[in-house]
């Protein structure tokens, strides 16, 4: 059997049928629809399109469950900043595997975190949004992920 190749694609460039397939899957997962027929009707998608894409399109966070993710942060140098950042990661259920922090220069520091998402209660997008909202975080991005 041929090994599957996956790509990370921004939602806004996906065809409507794929976006709506993700919406149908979300409706079913959250029990907001009683059946596939009900969910596709709510999402305005044909059942055939749903069945065509249902096993081919996934939210990013479902692909990184039980994975290791490396995050990069550019932070203002403030007392307690790293502690607050780590608290959000811990509250999400992630396990911190490694931390690397540069010495602050000109009031800024870089932090690289490798985390295990096996116990993550939230999806990665929720965690990333919480981290971005911290007033001392200038930049946060996913550098990579792997098993």
Curated annotation (Swiss-Prot):
Gene3D superfamilies: 3.30.70.260. Residues 70-145 form the ACT domain. Pfam families: ACT. It comes from the Bacteria. Disulfide bonds: none annotated. HAMAP family: UPF0735. Belongs to the UPF0735 family. This is UPF0735 ACT domain-containing protein BPUM_2431.
């Amino acid at each position: 059997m041929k090994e599957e190749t996956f790509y990370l694609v921004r939602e806004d460039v996906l065809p409507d049928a794929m976006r709506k397939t993700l919406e149908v899957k979300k409706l079913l997962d959250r029990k907001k629809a009683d059946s596939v027929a009900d969910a596709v009707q709510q999402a305005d998608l044909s059942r055939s399109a749903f069945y065509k894409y249902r096993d081919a399109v996934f939210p990013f966070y479902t692909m990184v469950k039980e994975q290791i993710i490396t995050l990069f942060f550019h932070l203002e140098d403030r007392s307690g900043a790293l502690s607050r950042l780590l608290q959000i990661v811990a509250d999400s259920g992630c396990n911190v595997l490694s931390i690397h922090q540069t010495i602050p220069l000109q009031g800024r520091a870089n932090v690289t975190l490798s985390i295990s998402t096996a116990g993550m209660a939230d999806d990665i997008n929720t965690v990333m949004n919480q981290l971005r909202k911290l007033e001392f975080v200038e930049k946060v991005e996913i550098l990579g992920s792997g098993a």
